[in-house]
């Protein structure tokens, strides 16, 4: 019995040592295997089969610790005929990445809403509370110089509407912005329309309205001159020439007085009594009503 036992022990040990060596070599060097493999033995079939026994030190696909040990990778195996298969790795749902991502996303969405509030407060500084009611603060009015007003007035008399190049040129020449020129023309047009609607004379038709430095005093009324002054004007026609602003009634009186005085002088030269012509001369050179 001892002889038989001695013969069986080496065979068992050699089989036990050869199987792990072959399987370990196959697992560490899978790329060196040829695509056409010879017929496998019982030991090889145990290794390549998913349900077969696995050597000590390596994780079996069906073991409980397989999913945890090889979580980020996939375990590949080769079948008997060279076909390859894979076991899918375990998903990352255990680590609750999706829930944490939604939490961070919600916090990120809440942050811009909090930052936008001070921006609105900064962009609306023109609203002021007066007696508990919001009131907008108006911008200060533009003060134009006399030179700028004269230039704008002359340009407005030429045309009431400016094109974009003309407005830019006028604003650059006067040292104003295009917005200021545009607003001035708009206000001027509205003022003219309001005056014309009320039936009044626009200021452009008044004398010397284009020159702001000129004196716009009203004209003096026509002077009704007596008889002596009319005679003096007839004897000295170049002393006081009639002005263009004189009314037609006064010019007509002067012409008639000169004609009557010339007629009276001719009559006085032919008639000896000079006192007889005083009454018709007084009637002729008198005032007309």
UniProtKB/Swiss-Prot annotation:
Annotated keywords: Activator, Deafness, Developmental protein, Disease variant, DNA-binding, Homeobox, Nucleus, Osteogenesis, Phosphoprotein, Transcription, Transcription regulation
InterPro entries in the cross-refs: Distal-less_Homeobox_TF, Distal-less_N, HD, HD_metazoa, Homeobox_CS, Homeodomain-like_sf, HTH_motif
Annotated localization: Nucleus
Disordered as annotated region, ranges: 1-49, 198-251, 270-289
Keyword Cytoplasm assigned: no
Phosphoserine PTM sites in chain numbering: 34, 217
DNA-binding residue intervals: 137-196
PROSITE patterns cross-referenced by the UniProt entry: HOMEOBOX_1 (PS00027), HOMEOBOX_2 (PS50071)
PTM annotation, UniProt: Phosphorylated. Phosphorylation of Ser-34 and Ser-217 by MAPK14 enhances its transcriptional activity. Phosphorylation by CaMK2 increases its protein stability.
Main location: nucleus
Similarity comment: Belongs to the distal-less homeobox family.
Disorder named in the UniProt entry: Split-hand/foot malformation 1 with sensorineural hearing loss, autosomal recessive: A disease characterized by the association of split-hand/foot malformation with deafness. Split-hand/foot malformation is a limb malformation involving the central rays of the autopod and presenting with syndactyly, median clefts of the hands and feet, and aplasia and/or hypoplasia of the phalanges, metacarpals, and metatarsals. Some patients have been found to have intellectual disability, ectodermal and craniofacial findings, and orofacial clefting.
The protein, known as: Homeobox protein DLX-5
Organism: Homo sapiens
Gene that this polypeptide is encoded by: DLX5
